[in-house]
Amino acid sequence: MDEKFAENCKVKTGIFRNAAGGLNYYCSYIPKNPIANVVICHGFCEFAEKYDEVVEAFLEKGYAVYLPEHRGHGYSQRECSDWDKVYIRSYDDYVQDLYCFIQRKIALKQRKTFLFAHSMGGAIGAIFLEKYPTIFDAAVFSAPMFGIRTGKCPQPIAHLIARMACLVGQGTAYAAGQHGFDGKEDFKNSSCTSEESYQRIFKLRNECVAYQTYGGTYQWLLAGILATKQLLKRKNMKKIRIPVLIFQAEWDHMVKNRAHLKFLIGTRQTSLLRIEGSKHEIFHAGEAQREVYYEQMFSFWEEQLREETAVMTEPFLEWQEKNDRVITRKVWQRNETKINETRKVLDLI
């Protein structure tokens, strides 16, 4: 991380006991007089150091940042002997680990606490908000995994294959199309739009065995499909009580964008912003896209800091242009009279 940020904040790394009693790794970055806390819930096959650019952006605005590594990722406890593989029994394990971290490492009463969750972390974060609706004050989901893209194989078939594989004792085997880290660069098929960001992350992964977690197992796939079904149940979505902002990437080949609209319909304080010209990792998009991304994110959080209850009810569908290069589509919170309009938007996104 850039030394100027390390000099102006207290940087700490450590371990905490997860819900199973194992040891998970975390980082925290506390500036002087922080305005609020941000907990980063990272995505599939990621690690804390990958988020250095995001952490720097948050620190510049005065936020204290907490970043735990999920079980089976980075330096945290592994449940599979092959460190290239991602294995989890249930997403509830991720959720309970996050709860343990927050309870043990963050003083919630000192200041407001926001959630920033990306991809798989979005699924974990959504389930967390449904189970613990009062811990966070607001949440930002960046390209959240509310629906998994399973390539040419329809999800119902992928679900069946994963379930059968687990039943016959192949839960720790790589799911079809998944594999270990091979040390080969592949920017074209990556989730980054910025090649500079891709090269930085690839170098980190290539140099550290703990960062080479790379492919999902059948048990991880099964758990992920079940998690997305769980979080999108109407009775569960209704439990979310806080303002939520979803960022959606135009060129997302990892998650289903249509699932974001289901979440929008099922919750009451959710807005959605689509970033044109971005791949899955919006925080590693081009400069123009990232400018819009952070501008809108910080504006959202600042609104929560100004008001005890911030409910967005302004235009249902609105367009924005930025530098003639980035077009963002903002879908605001729906009310009961606009559900049909929301469903029509599904054909546009």
Feature locations, PLM:
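Catalytic active-site module of serine/aspartate enzymes centered on a nucleophile-bearing elbow/loop
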Residues: 276-335, 346-349
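Short beta-strand/loop motif that positions the catalytic acidic residue
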Residues: 240, 246-248
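Conserved alpha/beta-hydrolase
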Residues: 57-81
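Active-site glycine-rich loops that stabilize anionic/oxyanionic intermediates
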Residues: 43-46
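Short alpha-helix in the alpha/beta-hydrolase fold that links the catalytic acid
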Residues: 242, 256-264
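Alpha/beta-hydrolase active-site loop
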Residues: 86-104
